[in-house]
UniProtKB/Swiss-Prot annotation:
The keyword Flavoprotein does not apply. PROSITE patterns: UBC_1, UBC_2. GO terms for biological process: protein neddylation. Belongs to the ubiquitin-conjugating enzyme family. UBC12 subfamily. Its EC number is 2.3.2.34. The active site is at residue 106. This is NEDD8-conjugating enzyme UBC12. The keyword Metal-binding does not apply. InterPro entries: Ub_conjugating_enzyme (IPR050113), UBQ-conjugat_E2_core (IPR000608), UBQ-conjugating_AS (IPR023313), UBQ-conjugating_enzyme/RWD (IPR016135). Accepts the ubiquitin-like protein NEDD8/RUB1 from the UBA3-ULA1 E1 complex and catalyzes its covalent attachment to other proteins.
Amino acid sequence: MLKIWSMKEKQAAEGGSAKKKVTAAQLRVQKDLSELSLPSTMKTHFPSAEDIMNFELTVRPDEGFYQGGEFRFSFYVNPNFPHEPPKVKCLQKVYHPNIDLEGNVCLNILREDWKPVLSLNAVMIGLQYLFLEPNASDPLNKDAAHQMTANREEFKRNVKHSMAGGSVAGERFDCVLIK
């Protein structure tokens, strides 16, 4: 034990260590990312190679209402991860029952159903599932949810129009079609 302290004192006297301390949250994120098994319809992107706590996910649904679109999400993993879920936001304005106009996402495992045993992979797969099976019973965009349950064909038309950058009910949406 004394030897460790003397080594630390010597290191401090020589200008300290260039190594940054790795937090428990960073270790868990490293583990989750190393175990990712994403389908070909999803891809991660790290704007800063040094910052694994902030990254983006791209989802390209290959079936359902949102087929042909490309949806980008930002992930912010806070220092309390995995005891708190990551913060996830959609970076585009999309017409979706579970995504509001500011990009907030309604996914139960990002709120009350979060458990520390859940991984980033589980969140990413949950996001993909929202595009395959939108959930009108737990909406953030109530207009889209109502349209989906009241008139599915019109909802489908509204989704296609909004994905092309059109307006629905006076609200303009971002073009998310794959180029």
